[in-house]
Amino acid sequence: MNSEQIRKFFADYQVVLKRVEQLEAAMRIKSDWDTWCAALRERAEFFRTEYAHMNALMRSVMPEFAKDEPDLDDDAWKQLQISMMDFYRADTHDLALLMELAKILQKHYGHSNNLAAMTDVDLTLAYTNLEFSRILREPYGTRARDYYRKISVLSRNFGAIKEHSVHQAIVVAYANLVMSCCVLGTVTMEEAFAIWEEMKELQASDALAATRESEPDVGRLLDIFTERFRTDAYALAKSFDRTMEAHTRFVPPELMSRIEQITAEYYEKLDKPEESTADMFQIITSQCEFDYETGRRTADECWKEIHTFFRKTKPKVKQFGEVDVRKIDVISYYMTCLDALISFLVETTMPMEDKKRYFREYQQDIRNFIADYDTRTGHSNTLNNALEELAFFPNAYALFDTAEEKIDYIFRLVVARHCTAFLHSLMVSAFAEAILSAIIDKEPTLMVGYHGVTSPEDVQAHRAEILQFAHDAALLHDVGKNSMLEIIETQHRPLTDEEFGIIRSHPNRGGQYLSIDEDLARYVDIARGHHKFYNGKGGYPNDFDNTASPERFMIDIITVCD
């Protein structure tokens, strides 16, 4: 293959990805039934024809790249590297394909002296592994950390390195090590603090000073990320990461004391501007969390400040995205503020009825944001992860009156946003209710002993309860797919082995999600078991025995319907 063929392949592929985004966006536009169905048919037809086209294209292109010695000249290899970085920087990209490209280039450049090319490869591998680690923690989290660390140690020779792209990569690696990798747990607080000290050394070095005029973006980014860790270190140390996978980080008392001192000094010197900026929401929420944890302010005081700020700035929020091309900041604004508001709301002393009223208000804010969100910004995976944190924040469940309200909340946030997942869950639910209705009418003895029913007459007496349980279980059976929907809904090309491995983790992921609340925990076994064989001797996950579950009957029903 020559460089022009490679360039054209990836240019065509980007066109396909853009079209996929447009079709997905069309499914979210409010319209009448006929218009919506027409959009659904157009989407299905595109995937049907494009899958065949891309499958043929992939089979003609990828095997050549995957050979031990691909038949590519220097220009072709250079174009492959350029295409990889174009994908890396694009709003729309394909993580699995990006990872495959990086692996191919890694074999080619691995033993060369081309530092810029190899750093591009390492940066891409770090990024793709980091994103996959948000779905399946290991082995991707450790790989991401190791690739970022490999890049960051290049800072020791910062002055001798002439390539601007390598300088940029060093700063990006540092930022992800002290923030993303720390949040995900692959970097300890002690390690993050030591890496931050390295960042400050680089920030004050003559080597960086010499590049501040010629490469202003490098110094500016390092300044931003060094300061960001200063504001977020306390929250990281206190494990404010409240997803269902949050884990206790042991931080030595002397380090915790040092972090608290640095944070207090920072906020004492901070001069907040009168006009709220796009960055102020991070500062305000972080300071409130710090003040509350250290006894400086009450939950009521912190909630009031964030609530007032949010109401004042919300009308201007879209300007943040217009000013900053990283429209991802709009997601961060909404999710950071709403997460903090709900967190403090639970802890306030206000009457429960008032808490529930504000919580309903915040739920509507979330729904309005999702409805207005421009899917063409290319950050839907980031939005999925943010919504996941809000949907599965355990303390919030104290503000619901019924189990049905909890299920509706989850369904709206992490299922109904995605058309195929939404339709699939509804169809499984309809099938399950139909099958169970027939069983109750014709063979009720099959259900004797299930959920404590003692006779066919008892089955009939509990008909409504059984059907409601099946309905809810079906709606939630695939909830573990939320963070991997971009993979699952990849219908324009064959999936890679990497992607299949990630998809197979969704039953356990769903079980983790549903374990956060007593009402939701009733559905854990169904989420975990719906891909197991009836006899328990096949399917996945391997660490779950569906034959020993008290929900075995319902697991089998949902499996058939699925």
Predicted regions and their residues:
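Amphipathic alpha-helical repeat scaffolds of TPR domains
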Residues: R7-R89, N114-I135, E163-T186, R212-A246, ...
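Helix-turn-helix repeat elements of alpha-solenoid scaffolds
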Residues: F10-R19, W33-M62, D86-H108, L136-N157, ...
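Non-transmembrane, amphipathic alpha-helical segments
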Residues: L136, T298-E301, E322-R326, M350-D354, ...
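Divalent metal-dependent phosphate-bond-processing catalytic cores, especially two-metal-ion Mg2+/Mn2+ enzymes
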Residues: E163, E201-E213, L236-D241, E245, ...
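Histidine/acidic-rich helix-loop-helix segments that form or flank divalent-metal centers
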Residues: H167, G219, D223, Y450-A474, ...
